[in-house]
């Protein structure tokens, strides 16, 4: 028992260390990828109204007048929970209250070491609005969309997988498999355009669904926001098509494999009806690969919602990324990509912990 606990602890420690290195690699890649792009960030911030003095002031304020290596160190310092800050007001790393929410740890002669929330900097195009605030306002909508999509995928995918397995080699089975293949191969942006046009425009009189819309919309008087759940239906269905197709295939194949096991034959020999055999023994023992698929797909949906959100006008993080790309708003792009990567890593760690808890072989390997 002690050996198992030690193996599990070592496993989790190794996963945490590997994840930190992965996150560091992602941060480095994001920084250098966007800093080799053509264009001057200071000019992007000022637009067409800049003059030489304004340009110099902005470059000094945001550290754009420093070398790439120095800017990289500034970027790491901004993102790190424990960071060093100069006591000189003219220095980029000066501890400004409007930039950092920090707790002082150690005060030195020329620097202060603090504990803070990661600082993702400010938007180029939104009048200095904090990137963290933009993400805080849009990420919940993306999470709601991803959760809705995965719920749709689980319910319909498992149901279709069971029907397909029970009616193996029938026309219904072949039709479900064909639909699954199409669902897995169909790009999400094409599905979004097709669904928005057909259900939101052609059949609008019957469905009452709109081509675009978000979770919260202003009322007719422009006084308050109301929840519009019907705007969630089309984007959630479109985003859930691919995981639905995968889950239905996994459920079908696993259920067929389970139904050929010896204990299923024993249950049949005892006189249980086929319905009870499938319900009590088949389905329960076929869900492991589905759980695996769901945990992996949920992280993918957070990143894959970009085009779906933009096409349906869903005010989530994906739509914000596309808008930032159109406006060359680099801090918003970098911060959003970094948050998505961080969520990927966290979800993968949680999945590995679940595996280690469920399957002893993971603890030993």
Language model regions located:
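N-terminal signal-anchor/first transmembrane alpha helix
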Residues: 1-67, 137, 154, 163, ...
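An internal, D/E-rich "acidic patch" concept
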Residues: 4-5, 65-154, 158
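Hydrophobic alpha-helical segments of integral membrane proteins
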Residues: 8, 12, 16, 54, ...
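Alpha-helical transmembrane segments of integral membrane proteins
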Residues: 9, 139-144, 148-172, 188, ...
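Transmembrane alpha-helical core residues of multi-pass small-molecule transporters
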Residues: 18, 26, 152-153, 180, ...
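Hydrophobic alpha-helical transmembrane segments of membrane transport/permease proteins
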Residues: 23-80, 84-100, 203-225
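Membrane-water interface segments at the C-terminal ends of transmembrane alpha-helices
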Residues: 30-36, 66, 179-212, 238-244
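Short, hydrophobic secondary-structure boundary micro-motifs
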Residues: 45, 88-89, 121-123, 191-192, ...
